[in-house]
Amino acid sequence: EPFQGEGGVNIPETHYLQGLRELCSQNDWLLMLDEVQSGVGRSGRWFAFQHSHIVPDVVTLAKGLGGGVPIGACLAKGAAAEVFQPGNHASTFGGNPLACNAALETLAVISDEGLLDHVVKLGDFLRNQFNRQLAGQKGVMQVRGQGLITGIELSIPCTDLVKRALEKKLLINVTSDRVIRLLPAFVMQQSEAEQIVDILCPLIKEFLNN
């Protein structure tokens, strides 16, 4: 993964993927990236690997590709694109016209409505607000993320916060026991981002101070 989602919203330094690309090229290995969670704009670019200025040989996509309609894709270039020949591999629902049209429309909307810039703007807003309002709070280890994926790492397990947030009508997730993960919709508005901050920051403070 160009960044880890389930692993705790871990964003690597730019040189990490660049080093992998160089290592693979030197040894004639394929660099294969899982962009199921990070791809199709989640990071603020079409692909998260673009932040590192590299190009992999194989990329897997799903989730955001269909805008809610199930679809997955495997992209390949160069020698990797020649591995499968016609008839080598089949899929019962491959090329489903409904799913493919949903994916085409999703890509068009993201492009035509400038959602990549929107993702960057709101993601930066959320992390800036969390850093400001949680500054000095004992037990808050780090706020990190890229685009519209944000992780808030606490010093203690915090899965109980999922239920507490739901009671306030806010859906969050906790990964690796101690990392609050936020993956809001691309169409979230500024006012909704402000609501997230207004609900979540007091919950975190209350949780850590009790």
Place the predicted regions along the sequence by residue:
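Conserved N-terminal phosphate-binding loop of PLP-dependent enzymes in the Aspartate aminotransferase
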Residues: 1-210
